[in-house]
Each structure stands twice: as C-alpha cells, then as structure tokens.
Amino acid sequence: MRRLTRMAAFVAAGMLVLSVGASAGPTAGAGPPLRYLAGPPGTLDPAFIADAGDVQLLLQLYAGLTRLDERGEPYPSLASGWNISDDGLTYQFAIRENLEFSDGSALTAEDVRRSWLRLLDPATGATAPDVLSVVVGATDRMAGDSGDDDVGITAVDDTTLIVELRYPASYFLEIVATPATFVVPRAADATQGWQTLDAFVGSGPYVADATDGADLVLRANDRYVAGAPPIDEIRWVGSIDGGATAAFAAGEVDLAGVPGWDATWIAYDADLGPRLHAAEPLTISYFGFDTTQPPFDDPRVRRAFALALDRERLVPLAEGASSQAAGSIVPPAIWPDGFSPNLGADPEEARDLLDDAGYEVRADLGTIVVNGSGLGVEPAVAVWREELGVDMAVETMSFGNFLDLLDTRPPQIFTVNWIADYPSPHALYGLLLEPGAASNFGDWHDPEFETLLEAAAAAGESEIGGAYAAVEAYVSEQAPVIPWAYGETWWLVADGLRGLGNLTIGLLDFGRVSWDE
C-alpha cells in the first residue's frame, strides 16, 4: 500500500518551515555533496510507491507537468502552461519543446500519456493509480473494463496534451505534481525491474548513479527541464550507527529528521538548538473499520466508538507529547478557510448509540479485534472496554504482513498512518474514503458522501471552505474512520543549506536546494 508510513521511519512527513535558508529557486555553485539521512532506498519506479520514503526519492529522479513551490502551489515544470475550459472539465497542457530524458532521448506529450496509461493499466499492478481517478475512463481502465483509447488523455502532438475530467477538480494541477504521475522513459514496462542503476534513465533533477555501501548516490541531471541543480551530488544515506541526532552532531549527515522526544531537549542545546526546525504535520494516523461486516456496517456503532474517545487526553498518552489530537483525516496545514473539525467526546451518547443499534447486551458484539500495527492503541482500547463495556482484543504483526492483511481481509478495526499525496483535502477524502479507491481499506460506500465530495472538488475559492466543511460533517456523522493524531516532525539542518523553504507534505525538492557560496 502506497504512502502508508512506518512509525519508526527515518523521516516523517510534514511541511518544513525553516526560519533560515528559504529561497525562490536554485543558486549557482555546487559545493560539497548533500548527505541526507533518508533510510534505505526503495523503488526506482513511480508506479510502485510504497511509502513516504519512496515519494521523497522519486521526486528527485523524475518530473511531471507541474511541481510544488515553497507555499505548496503548483508551478510549470514539463508543461510551460495550461488552459482550463470554462466548465473545468478539460485541461490543455502546453508541453515544453526540446525536452529530454537524462539519456538525451526526446520527451514529448506522448511520453506523458504513455506514463499515465501505464499507471492505470491493471497489468502494471501500480500501487497508486487512483490519483488519476478523476480522469474520464480512468476508473474503468484500472478495473480492466476498458482500453487505453477510452481514457481521456490525448497527445495531440509533441507539445500538446489534453486531459478530460469526470467532474471539475480544482486540485488537478496539484495531482500532476505527485510522483506517481511523473514521466518515465519508453523502456518502462509492467515489471518492477526495468530500471537499474547501471542504465538509469529519468526525467528529474537527479539520476540514480550508484550505491556506496548502504548509501544511494544521486548525480545532477544536466538535461533536467530547469537546468542542472546547484548541488552536484546527493548522498541518500541508508543507515547509520546510532541515532539521527548523534549522526548529525558528529557531522556525518547534513539533513535529518528527528523524533519529537529528541526535539524536546535539542531545542535547549546551545549547538544543535539553532539548527532544529519544526515541520507542520501533513500526516494523519487513524482507526479504520471494516464497514462491510457487522457490527461496523452500522454507522451508529462506528459513531459510538468514535464518541467514546477523548482524543485530546488520549493521544499524548499513546503517541507522546509531540503528537496532536486529530479531529479530521485532513491535517491542519491544508484546512481551507472556515474548516473546523469537532474533537468532542461524549461517552454517554456513545452508549446510547450502541443501545439503539441493538447491542444493549454488549456481549452480542462478540470480541472486537483491533490490529495495532503502527499505533499505540492501548489507551483507546482501554476506553472502549471501560466506557462501552465491549470485550476487546489486540493483534499485532509485521508491517509487511499488515499490508497484505489490508488487501485481503481488513480487521474489524485497523490502524493506518498516512501521508497526503498533494496539498488538498481531496487527497485524504478521495483516496481514503471514495468507493473503489485502492486505499479505502474499510470498503466504505456512501452515495451522499460522493455527492458532497464532488461538489467540494468543483467549488470556487470562496466556497471551498464551506463545501469541505459539509464533507467533514458528514464523514464525522457516518464515522467510517476515527481520526487519531497528526504527527509533528522535526529536522536538523546543516548551516549554509539554502532553498528548503516551506516545502509542502515534507517533500524536499533538492533540485531547488543549494549551499551558501
């Protein structure tokens, strides 16, 4: 499952807010290699994103029609511009002339189309095809019910791409800034082994060049659309002896994410404190329900389990003081104006809801199994036992086995840590709760939700806050998930490193980063 995050990962996702080193773009001068403590590298293929670490790496190796600036706004990349029809259903992208892949081969509008169709092709088995589900015909293509020609993606000529949408989507320019939609060379096929280090071909600011022990070495791509990046070499540090803080203090790495419990003392350290920077959270952890089977096919039961939890009290107990209780699956950094989720708990109403659902005798619920892989679930489980009188059991397993379980038989209650694909509420509501979405793990289907979500997607700037507030109110009432916590991220940043800015969803675009001259 893509974009799921491990709680113990080297880097959590967030919006990196640096008080120093922000810049509008690359500056001249290569300087020394940048050593980024990233953890072991994963896939080299945008079709097979597994977690936040993959997203981070692929952002360096490939490019799409747009990219995100320091404010999280899309700006032209492979596309020089675009026109949007009055009804918001047709996007015409102007692809830049004379684009090249890193090996010098031409990159045209047909390569964009081919890359997107490969993502949607069920034979590929991509992990994130549903990012393009708003495109006409994409859902049927993903299901194997239609062919490439039925998808609303047309390369008119080398420099013109036309995309037709099922409904207006104000966030579509953000979608095409996500690595899953980035352009891969013609050698890409439906396997995961076509891309190798000894013959790497990409479209981004860097190329994967070699491994050095546990590190992956990235070299600047002179053929990148924005020109060769300022730093010639990135060391993708795969492992270290000891913790991230010790490695940074010893000068072994230049950029490292650190956990909140370290940040609490680092902030007071005379040497490290000035180099510590907070990141606004853009990850969400939540409890999900198998909504296809009793008792959680009944929204009253789901709502009861949600109302029983005083998250403002429980989250610090379970996740630590650096975590923030979540009232919505949409992180605060991308809340539209007027969006204010409710965190309130009401155990008495929760008990009444269970009674109304026919479970006055709690034993009729049976033993409710919670899969605790990824979250500290015990405080919540204790409340469900004590406040609701429900018999609870907790199961844990390896992360890999948990992913397999979500695909085949979701537990009655499961836990997920998630990073947004792009800075829009739709990146959470659509990809996690829309019917047919690969990451709708609880298989929730609700026509009223679909209607509200489509209305929010098409809302104008002055209406978007109210439209998504209506979506949130309905999701809160139906409770297909229980939002749990937003995880705060902290970074240690070497002196002289510039261009990190306010990078949305924690994705560090090293093509825009430089050292002081």
Predicted regions span which residues?
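N-terminal lobe/hinge region of extracytoplasmic solute-binding protein
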Residues: 37-86, 117, 201, 507
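Gly/Pro-rich hinge or "lid" segments in bacterial periplasmic/extracellular proteins
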Residues: 149, 154, 165-229, 233, ...
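Long beta-strand-rich cores associated with HINT superfamily self-processing modules
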Residues: 491-517
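Structural transition elements
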Residues: 324-357, 372, 376
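Ligand-site clamp/hinge motif
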Residues: 194, 214, 222-266
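Extracytoplasmic/peripheral linker and loop segments enriched in polar/acidic and small residues
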Residues: 154, 315, 390-407, 416, ...
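Ligand/substrate-recognition segments at binding pockets and active sites
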Residues: 355-420, 489
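Surface-exposed binding/hinge segments that line
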Residues: 94, 111, 120, 124-186
